[in-house]
Amino acid sequence: MKSDFVEVCILGKTVGLKGALKLHDRSDFPNQFKNGAKFYDINSKEFVIKSYDRNNNLVIFENYDSIDLAKTLVNYILYRSINDTIRDCKLAKDEFFYFDIIGCNVFEDKILLGEVIDILEVGAGFLFSIKTEGDLVKAGLNSNFYIPYNDNFTQNIDIKSKKIQVKNSLDILKNS
């Protein structure tokens, strides 16, 4: 899958005889699942939603409106283009897409700590997984560590410059 796509759901078992599939939403934007919305598999094959039951998370795709056809899609992972995601998924103030955060450099004061390589959901919060900057690794610090995404650690996120300013995080790295 090209890097301009983001994973949004996994298709589960079939339900009923008309081609409905259980949709397991892996995004924070359930409103993107609507009639006519386009999604893609790992090979860039397009799937268009014919109908979506939001209450039961059941989806039927165009040209897959029988149980036999739908069974061929069980366990498929579907993706959405980043452009469609940005257009259709509205963010509140101080909210960001994962794909905007991943790849950002993390600084405490003027010290480059590393780069965000993943975001983990833990309980009610999030952790930035950081690949430690090379010189810090050479100095004996761990090659990876985690920073909680909350006001005690994250001061500023600047998506345009791909920089995250943090505090109290060098101590986390030193004690990892």
Curated annotation (Swiss-Prot):
Keyword annotations: Chaperone, Cytoplasm, Ribosome biogenesis, rRNA processing
PRC barrel domain boundaries: 93-172
Entry GO terms, CC: cytoplasm; ribosome
GO biological process: one example: rRNA processing
Annotated compartments: Cytoplasm
Alphabetized GO MF terms: ribosome binding
Pfam families: PRC_RimM, RimM
Cross-referenced SUPFAM superfamilies: PRC-barrel domain, Translation proteins
Annotated transmembrane regions: none
Entry's family note: Belongs to the RimM family.
Classification via NCBIfam families: 16S_RimM
Quaternary organization: Binds ribosomal protein uS19.
Free-text domain note: The PRC barrel domain binds ribosomal protein uS19.
PANTHER family: RIBOSOME MATURATION FACTOR RIMM (PTHR33692:SF1)
Biological role stated in the UniProt entry: An accessory protein needed during the final step in the assembly of 30S ribosomal subunit, possibly for assembly of the head region. Essential for efficient processing of 16S rRNA. May be needed both before and after RbfA during the maturation of 16S rRNA. It has affinity for free ribosomal 30S subunits but not for 70S ribosomes.
The protein's name in its UniProt record: Ribosome maturation factor RimM
